[in-house]
Amino acid sequence: MSIVLHGVAAGKGIAIGHAHLITRGTAEVPQYDIDPDKLDAEVARFDNAIKATRKELEQLRGAIPENAPTELGAFISLHLMLLTDVTLSREPIDILREQKINAEWALKLQSDKLAAQFDSIDDDYLRERKQDMLQVVRRIHNNLVGQSNEINLAGNLLDDTVLIAHDLSPADTVLFKEQHITAFVTDAGGPTSHTAILGRSLDIPSVIGLHNARKLITENEIVIVDGINGVLIIDPDEVVLNEYRRLAREYRSHKRELNKIKKTAATTADGINIELLANIESAEDIKALHNFGADGVGLFRSEFLYLNRDSMPTEDEQYEVYAGIVKKLKGKNITIRTVDLGVDKNPRWFGQNSTPNGSLNPALGLTGIRLCLAEPVMFRTQMRAILRAAAHGPVRMMWPMITSISEVRQCLIHLDTAQRQLTERGETFGPVSIGCMIEIPSAAMTVGSILKLVDFVSIGTNDLIQYLLSVDRGDDSVSHLYQPGHPAVLKTLQHIIRTANRMEKGVSICGEMAGDTVFTRLLLGMGLRRFSMNPNNLLSVKNIILHSHTGHLENDAAKILRCEDPEKAEKLIKILNQSEQAESQAV
């Protein structure tokens, strides 16, 4: 009997193959006391495990094939950075000595503490980094107990092998190039987890976040991985198999056609130019940006320069990163978002003004621009680095989590101070356009006042939807209430877009809605002309744009915006995408 499981679509595509179960699970953690005179030996054992883990990761990074996606090396580098952080390399030793316990148990106590801290982070992407931390912990643990860190792919794998695992690390995926891996599914992972990102980057059909797939699948069982809709079908019947074989052929044909429009300008059927930008978090992502023909960078997440370290990154260190990216863009625009962190994410080097106060809801506490304003030295240091990078090409600076015009005014004062400091030092710096992230309802409602002070706004739909609907999409019990097509969300977006257009100020969306083709035509009809997304979604969105007529879509959008019922709005959006005009977009 067939079983259908629903998860998160990661790598797009459809695959039919034989399941190969990766049985590596959660390791049993021993717990025992250590005699005081043996504590030094236990510390040495832990240090040796750290060294062995570092050697493994460095060897893996050196073994990455040249044609592998840049994200693979970036994630292994992230694991190395996490390994060297004191929270994993030194603090377990403090626990070991204080409680006189074995290294494995001390490591577990510390990882449980860190996992709870990650769970309290509001930002989806940063919260998902918990899995990276846990994978590093697993490597350390395995080296402590003498277990292998490699997944078992022994035996003769079939040409259509589908890996079934609890989770896959970046290091695991290095093996994909050497093995017959058609697709993979995991029980763990969310939309912004490294597993999802690597699935997209490796261009392998994949579905993650299935929870119990491994318990329901037997070795070599036939499975269908639908990486388009996030569906796994176990033991399908012949009718379903034939239908998915047809869908797989259609998808491959569709993909070949999409590759033909990489260098085509994103212009609608009625001649409206649309700007398609990429969201990135490292210099390594520039390759993907160029590969998919992005017009520039709509969001550079700068906070990764600040994570997992004991001191704030220096101005010169930040300048080198920003300037390097600006130069690689060769004249294309980049929007750098100033650091979007909370005290719950990395409190070790924050000043007294931002000491954690035990807030039960860090998302509503000292986060985003509030933290920047509480740490003016950090804020001005970053802005000086961005200003200096702007001497090498067009740069926009964007402030996160703005709630009011008073915050914007304070930011402008700090910007003026940063510019004056550079002038006094005789440093060369360039002009920057200034903008704000609109991701808080208060900012959305007062966007007109905010736009009087800045050049552009970018809508962070991920957080805006969560705040508007009071729902945490990372919580499985309420995630179904996260509805981008909810009338309250659509009316809020329309207000922001219409206000910015009327004031002739720039407006974009940089949340997931920008890369979701379900909403492309609706957003065009609402007047959006700048989309910023994961580079992997650019061609699919461009294809819809090329076949869209904005004049027709404006009428359709107006009808949808008059809806008051979420279900009716969703139905009308589906009708919009299934209309004759939408059908003409099919490649």
Q: Can you describe what each PLM-predicted range is?
A:
Residues 1-328, 334-341, 375, 382-383, ...:
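Non-catalytic, soluble scaffold/interaction modules
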Residues 255-587:
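Conserved alpha/beta-domain cores
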